[in-house]
Amino acid sequence: MGSESYWLDTAPAFTGAQLGALPGQVDVAVVGGGFTGLAAARALALKGASVVVLEAGRVIGEASGRNGGQCNTGVAQDYAGLSASLGADKARAYYQAYESAVQSVVSLVEQEQIACDLKRNGKLKLAAKPMHYEGLARTCELIRQEVDAEVELLTAEQTRAEVNSAQFHGGLLQRNGVQMHVGRFGVGLAEAAARHGALIHQGTSVTDWKAQAGGYRVNTSKGSLHAGQ
């Protein structure tokens, strides 16, 4: 059995990496080539900024390439509990922030035509006990009232049809979640950032940075550069 992440093991090679010396000066230096860093670099490059991504290993080589491959809506805490503790407005804002994040990922895939097997199957939260189902029913009703009319409460029979198991008493289906091959997504995102002008240096560890006139001096394992931000 291999120790490499399945996503990384089956991702295409990244062809857009810089092989030469670091640039002497850029508008923005991004530390880390995970999803967040690559998405930021792409967005900045599209706005006309000069951007360098400094990645100690390979792009998406850590948490971004080692996860469940899911991009889901919904809050980790029970929505009914969240609404009760924070109020409907804040709970709704949290829920909608997750929905916006999922849509941002979907939009990236569509805009850059990233082949990552994206599927919008939704997320199913399962009830292992009758009391769990009762809680899901209350949560479902509140979500429908406050923020998402498309959420659906599934019976035990409907849940069995979804998961091919009779062990559950029902489930809560939130339709906006997506699943994808995160290795292909990450490499596709890196290729897109590079295509739009971001300079991506792999195997380049940032050792420290210091504020100086007009920005920062960023020191790496492959030399130093000046970044405005």
Question: Where would I find each of the regions flagged by the language model?
Answer:
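Extreme N-terminal leader/targeting segments of oxidoreductases
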Residues: M1-V28, L46
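N-terminal Rossmann-like FAD-binding beta1-loop-alpha1 element of flavoenzymes
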Residues: V26-V53
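Short phosphate-binding/catalytic loops that engage adenosine nucleotides
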Residues: A49, D148-A149, A198
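Short, hinge-like loop/turn segments at secondary-structure boundaries
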Residues: G68-T73, L136, H169-G170
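Helical element adjacent to the flavin cofactor pocket in flavoenzyme catalytic cores
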Residues: E141-Q145, A166-G228
